[in-house]
Amino acid sequence: MMLEYVLGLSAYLFSIGIYGLITSRNMVRALMCLELILNAVNINFVTFSDFFDSRQLKGNIFSIFVISIAAAEAAIGPAIVSSIYRNRKSIRINQLNLLNK
């Protein structure tokens, strides 16, 4: 019974993240939605690891790996956004064309 609630929460977070990523015009909001998607995936890894094989920690270890990748993305993403803002004076995705100068 608990499995359905956790998977529902994960699907809800994933859906919000996908919707925000598709409709977002701001790069910071897109990065936040990407974090929501990664957190939903982590919830699935931990839930299925606990539900199917609680003695082996493969899902938990992989979720720690995904958390470290998300931390690197959270550190590098705003730095890239700030450098784009410094050069282009905008962080709107539809106004950026990095191939033209």
From Swiss-Prot:
GO BP, one annotated term: photosynthesis, light reaction
Record keywords, A-Z: Chloroplast, Membrane, NAD, NADP, Plastid, Plastoquinone, Quinone, Thylakoid, Translocase, Transmembrane, Transmembrane helix, Transport
EC identifiers of the protein: 7.1.1.-
Keyword Transport on entry: yes
UniProt GO MF annotations: oxidoreductase activity, acting on NAD(P)H, quinone or similar compound as acceptor; quinone binding
Keyword Thylakoid carried by entry: yes
Gene3D superfamilies in the record: 1.10.287.3510
Top EC class, one word: translocase
Catalytic function, reaction form: a plastoquinone + NADH + (n+1) H(+)(in) = a plastoquinol + NAD(+) + n H(+)(out); a plastoquinone + NADPH + (n+1) H(+)(in) = a plastoquinol + NADP(+) + n H(+)(out)
InterPro entries recorded: NADH_UbQ_OxRdtase_chain4L/K, NUOK/Mnh_C1-like
Pfam families listed in its UniProt record: Oxidored_q2 (PF00420)
Membrane topology type: Multi-pass membrane protein
Subunit structure: NDH is composed of at least 16 different subunits, 5 of which are encoded in the nucleus.
Function: NDH shuttles electrons from NAD(P)H:plastoquinone, via FMN and iron-sulfur (Fe-S) centers, to quinones in the photosynthetic chain and possibly in a chloroplast respiratory chain. The immediate electron acceptor for the enzyme in this species is believed to be plastoquinone. Couples the redox reaction to proton translocation, and thus conserves the redox energy in a proton gradient.
Designated name of the protein: NAD(P)H-quinone oxidoreductase subunit 4L, chloroplastic
Organism of origin: Populus trichocarpa (Western balsam poplar)
Taxon lineage: Eukaryota, Viridiplantae, Streptophyta, Embryophyta, Tracheophyta
Protein's gene: ndhE
